[in-house]
Amino acid sequence: MSKSNIEHTNGESRTPLLVIGAGPYGLATAAYARRVGIEPLVVGQPMAFWRDNMPAGMFLRSGADWHLDAAREDTFESYLEERGIDPADVDPIPVRLFIDYATWFQEKAGLEVLPDMVEELSHPNGHFEATLQSGRRITADAVVAAPGITHFTVMPRWVEESLSPGRWSHTCTTVDFEEMRGSRVLIVGGRQSAFEWAALLADMDAEEIHVIYRHDTPEFTASDWSFVDGLMDLTASIPGWFRNLLAAERDAVARRFWAEGRLKLEPWLTQRLDKPSVHRWPHAFVIGCRELPDGGIQVELSNGNQLVVDHVILATGYKPDMTKVPYLAGVLDDLELADGFPVLDEHFQSSLPGLFVTGFPATKDFGPFFGFVRGCPVAATLTVAGVEGALDRTGSLA
């Protein structure tokens, strides 16, 4: 089979490369595969998490130099230039603008995305078989899984034990703030997403917004991500450098990211949060909550205070756990995991030959930068090189 050949017959397809997921990492990898002559079959809803799980009024923390193109041609800056947009006029970058860039990038790359969902992936007879929600079946010689963060939300146990469905939500499912106008809301968490959601609620005239967190209030100052460029270049030239560091050295890299991403809040939030309705509760956590007969939620804080709110929002982040990715259930026995993360080689290949995992789940082996869009071009380059090797071994590039 030619590496650029996708065959379709009677609801079944055969492809050298199946890419599961059409977010930034999936699109970046598929585009680069196509550039080197491997025609990928991409399954997913393009930028679905960004469209459906990020509020329309959200802004990105990145600059205009972060993009998806491993070839460095169809960059975000190129998109702005073609659209006649001055980068200074979109700083910070609205999330909807970056989604439009991703659509532009997909079109430039000539990527056709099958708007379906993979329900099950199996590995019979040395190849992969994917069953889609539509019933369609795909046979592939190699697979790139780009699951994003959808499946990896962190949920405190007390929430489900104490509150009925509908009385609480995670930030990723809280995108329509109109229904919270005039409401009393508790946000659990004290990093960027917590304070940005607080600002969005304040913009929507929520009656009370309480932000509770265990640590000091982060500093409102712009993050400096310039140091990431050197780390990306290092990863491109020496893919295994991060995993080969001593534990203390890896921790030092992680602390640098923590300092920029977690100990700082974007200064453009300051004015939006400077309202009587916004209350900060540092050095505190929830020790109990219960629903009241009048419909309120009584929340007890560790500092002795009690609050009554109408809704609880969890800004509690994400943690990779590949056992939570539904379509991987059929191949989990073949995947080596470390604390939920996939164990990957220097080309993002898992312990199951031919199955690659990119994006957020790769952060344990490649570093925290692969939880950011900035890692897309390097991840695409390394992954596609690995895919080429896998296809060579199976004879699919003959």
Q: What does each of the following model-derived ranges do?
A:
Residues S2-M47, V90-D203, E208-A398:
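Flavin (primarily FAD) cofactor-binding/catalytic cores of flavoenzymes
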Residues R51-G84, D229-E249:
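Flavin (FAD/FMN) cofactor-binding and adjacent substrate-gating region
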